[in-house]
Amino acid sequence: MTHQTAVSSASPTNRSHHKPHYELIALPARSDNYIWLIRNQTHAWVVDPSLAEPVRDYIAQHGLTLADLLITHHHYDHVEGIVELAPWVQGRIIGDSERIHGLTERLHAPTEFTLSFSDVHAQVLSTPGHTYDHVSYYCPHLLQTPVLFCGDALFSAGCGRVFDGTMAQAFETIEQFIQLPDETLIACAHEYTLSNLDFALRIQSAHEATQAHLNQVKYARERGLPSLPSSIGLEKRINPFCRAVSIGLSTEPLDTAWIEGLNHLAQSVQLPAVSLANVDTREPNARKALALALFTLCRELKNRI
């Protein structure tokens, strides 16, 4: 059984009645979902309630009032708890899709808003790809570091499958994410980290940062602890999709060992390799086109493997 995990907003020395103390809680649900719960001493705010029971149990156990529900997209494993939790909600049920039933307020990107009964500011980010209307919620000052609630748009060492969005949209969403501060915490909705790291190491088995993180995640998971939240800085080092997208934003020499590993893996499952021939890496548009091609190949490979 996976246990809850908490990330705190304040050390004991800087907590006071002038600055509410917030915590970020990962509530396990279903086989691999996390329901993210923000709490202070009196209220709770919940992201993507895939089930009602874990939320109800937590707020009852801790004597909290359920303030808001924040929804990233319409898939059942992100919304199934809405109907049952709605009578408990004292604030709003927020999302940005007509396909999400039970919303009380639609907030369109790039809206900035404040969580009900709090001083926590959040931004709605348009993050399509996994679905065409997927959004994420960015809280720049929730904890001592920013927090990104990104649903299925980004996972630790991976990203969501492209369903009714497009590959270009998914690419641009990751491009948006990796330009956030490196210390930004990634609160994604699924515990896929081990399988994603295995995939990353099939591309480049000798990558030290990825191997080191795999060892850390195995240690945590063997003890029933979540591998999340991750961070933008970590994902830029270990996530194949972030590494591909980063090529389009960088002027550094290409990591040819990683690209060769990706192409070798592609050829092993009869997918065409991405050619570096005639790519002028000094030209920004050429680098971005290469980055998109590598990102697309990563996604097609992950779908197969």
Cite the ranges covered by each PLM segment:
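Active-site-adjacent loop/tail segments of enzyme domains
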Residues: G158-T184
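Active-site HxH/HxHxD metal-binding segment of metal-dependent hydrolases
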Residues: R30-S31, A44, L51-S126, T145-P146, ...
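Accessory terminal helices/loops
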Residues: T2-S11, E175-L185, L194-I305
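A short acidic, helix-capping loop that chelates divalent metal ions and anchors anionic groups
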Residues: L103, A157-F163, N196
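Residue-level signal for inorganic ion chemistry
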Residues: I38, D48, L85, D152, ...
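Conserved beta-strand hairpin/beta-sheet module of binuclear metal-dependent hydrolase folds
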Residues: N14-L64, Y137-G151
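Core dinuclear metal-dependent hydrolase active-site scaffold
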Residues: L37-R39, E112-L143, Q179
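Active-site metal-binding loops of divalent metal-dependent hydrolases
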Residues: P49-L51, H74, E98, H130-T131, ...
